[in-house]
């Protein structure tokens, strides 16, 4: 795609998000991301953004996909996370296996709602799922599944082959967990007793972890969108909120702080979207963007004062989502270990 095409894509995604996502952002937070909204995302090609066209997807390149994620996250990080799960976790695992490729068409059209059991591979956890294969049954429990309302899931079985399983039914929620952020997506524990499953490959945990590591630039894009959405609200609020007969923007601590954050946003974006990245550069983009999102959303919340904690102002969700997203999609210590291995050409930073 040419530069002009990327600009046109950004403009069209932003227009769609503002019209169809931002207008129901509070509803998404309160009631979750509806099937209707998912179909709306699919109608624009977002649910299959990285799925090849031969399997019903849009087949966007890396930069175009990042633009989609960033612009959706400006309005609803939950919507961006739903697209991320479909395109950067679920679909790559299916494509790599070469099996059940037909399901990708249903993912792209939002006929199928998907999830991947990846939370056990996050920092502070060390486990496979509790799913075992007994004959023609897959049985057990999956704890802390993001998008737990999915009808099709991928899990790594707790067996000698650590099989990667595609499970299309025979499971249900046994517990819905409270969540700090990404409230548009269900966060649940599932009980599985299914005969409707397929072994995609062996070494499932390793493959899921590799997919997580491959999301460096995508995670950076979502984090940038979260930061940009929060800062936009803070800048606009500082223009209209008066104190001592002056708008907040007239005061140096507010104006200087927001200006520096806006400038830093552009620096992080320029780096994340550069044409060529080394492996180390991708990790840096992820770490910097995630850290920036947490800092920027915190400052945006402070600019709003007490009003920032009211849901109707729409800024507190960005702070919550920045924190939740960093926990669910960024593994700081492991990311830094990967970076150190790239720099030192050997295992480093493990003591």
Regions from the language model: what does each represent?
Residues 139-174:
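A short core secondary-structure module
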Residues 109-122, 155:
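A short, Trp-centered hydrophobic/proline-enriched beta-strand micro-motif
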Residues 2-9, 173-266, 325:
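Glycine-rich beta->alpha junctions and the first turn(s) of the following alpha-helix
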Residues 1-84, 342-351:
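Amphipathic, small/basic residue-rich leader segments at the start of a protein or domain
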Residues 21, 80-100:
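N-terminal glycine-rich flavin-associated loop
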Residues 96-115:
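FAD-binding glycine-rich core of flavoenzymes that anchor FAD
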Residues 21-32, 239, 243-246, 262-291, ...:
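C-terminal helix-coil-helix/basic helical segment that borders enzyme active sites and/or dimer interfaces
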Residues 2, 68, 89, 304-351:
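Glycine-rich phosphate/cofactor-binding loops in nucleotide/flavin-utilizing enzymes
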């Amino acid at each position: 795609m040419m530069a002009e095409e990327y600009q046109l894509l950004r403009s069209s995604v932003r227009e769609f998000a503002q019209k169809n996502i931002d207008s129901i952002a509070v509803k998404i937070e309160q009631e979750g991301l509806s099937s209707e909204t998912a179909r709306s995302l699919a109608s624009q090609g977002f649910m299959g953004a990285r799925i090849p066209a031969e399997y019903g997807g849009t087949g966007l390149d890396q930069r175009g996909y990042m633009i989609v994620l960033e612009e959706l996250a400006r309005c609803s990080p939950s919507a961006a996370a739903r697209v991320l799960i479909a395109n950067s976790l679920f679909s790559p695992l299916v494509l790599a296996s070469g099996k059940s490729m037909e399901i990708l068409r249903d993912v792209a059209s939002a006929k199928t709602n998907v999830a991947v059991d990846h939370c056990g591979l996050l920092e502070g956890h060390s486990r496979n799922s509790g799913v075992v294969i007994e004959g023609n049954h897959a049985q057990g429990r999956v704890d802390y599944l993001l998008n737990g309302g999915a009808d099709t899931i991928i899990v790594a079985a707790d067996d000698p082959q650590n099989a990667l399983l595609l499970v299309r039914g025979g499971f249900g929620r046994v517990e819905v967990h409270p969540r700090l952020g990404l409230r548009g997506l269900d966060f649940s524990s599932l009980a599985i007793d299914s005969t409707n499953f397929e072994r995609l490959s062996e070494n499932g945990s390793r493959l899921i972890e590799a997919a997580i590591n491959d999301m460096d630039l995508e995670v950076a894009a979502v984090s940038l969108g979260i930061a940009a959405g929060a800062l936009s609200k803070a800048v606009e609020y500082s223009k209209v909120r008066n104190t001592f007969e002056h708008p907040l923007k007239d005061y140096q601590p507010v104006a200087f702080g927001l200006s520096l954050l806006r400038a830093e946003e552009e620096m992080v974006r320029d780096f994340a979207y550069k044409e060529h990245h080394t492996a180390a550069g991708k990790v840096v983009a992820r770490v910097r963007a995630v850290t920036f999102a947490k800092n920027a959303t915190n400052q945006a919340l402070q600019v709003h004062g007490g009003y920032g904690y009211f849901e109707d102002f729409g800024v507190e969700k960005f702070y919550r989502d920045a924190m939740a997203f960093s926990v669910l999609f960024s593994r700081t210590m492991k990311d830094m270990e990967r970076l150190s291995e790239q720099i030192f050409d050997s295992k480093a930073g493990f003591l």
